Amino acid sequence: MASVVTKKSKKSGDTINAKLALTMKSGKYVLGYKSTLKTLRSGKAKLILIAGNCPPLRKSELEYYAMLSKANVHHYAGTNIDLGTACGKLFRVGVLAITDAGDSDILDA
């Protein structure tokens, strides 16, 4: 029974990765903590993705700004290395703000 649960969570992780890859190709996004905060303060961010190993203080600050700007927050299941790989980058990505999803339906998830 536990294997079914892990398969389901792995599948949802795969779908978020696929949607994220499509957003990277066709949408607009901002990588990094400082740039994400600027995007949140200007009200342009629609979705924030936070890596699982992001420090708690930084995570709570991002959630607070997202609440003020009415942006959705998604806590990515993997680490910042996994999030960077899912974005198609060769570096770590701790925080990511999506301003325009493009052809992807990641904002509906």
From Swiss-Prot:
It holds the Pfam family Ribosomal_L7Ae. One of its GO terms (cellular component) is preribosome. The keyword Ribonucleoprotein applies. InterPro entries: Ribosomal_eL30-like, Ribosomal_eL30-like_sf, Ribosomal_eL30_CS, Ribosomal_eL8/eL30/eS12/Gad45. One of its GO terms (biological process) is rRNA processing. Its main location: cytoplasm. It is found in: Cytoplasm. One of its GO terms (molecular function) is structural constituent of ribosome. Keywords: Cytoplasm, Ribonucleoprotein, Ribosomal protein. Belongs to the eukaryotic ribosomal protein eL30 family. There are 2 genes for eL30 in S.pombe. Component of the large ribosomal subunit (LSU). Mature yeast ribosomes consist of a small (40S) and a large (60S) subunit. The 40S small subunit contains 1 molecule of ribosomal RNA (18S rRNA) and at least 33 different proteins. The large 60S subunit contains 3 rRNA molecules (25S, 5.8S and 5S rRNA) and at least 46 different proteins. Component of the ribosome, a large ribonucleoprotein complex responsible for the synthesis of proteins in the cell. The small ribosomal subunit (SSU) binds messenger RNAs (mRNAs) and translates the encoded message by selecting cognate aminoacyl-transfer RNA (tRNA) molecules. The large subunit (LSU) contains the ribosomal catalytic site termed the peptidyl transferase center (PTC), which catalyzes the formation of peptide bonds, thereby polymerizing the amino acids delivered by tRNAs into a polypeptide chain. This is Large ribosomal subunit protein eL30A. It comes from Schizosaccharomyces pombe (strain 972 / ATCC 24843) (Fission yeast). The gene is rpl3001.
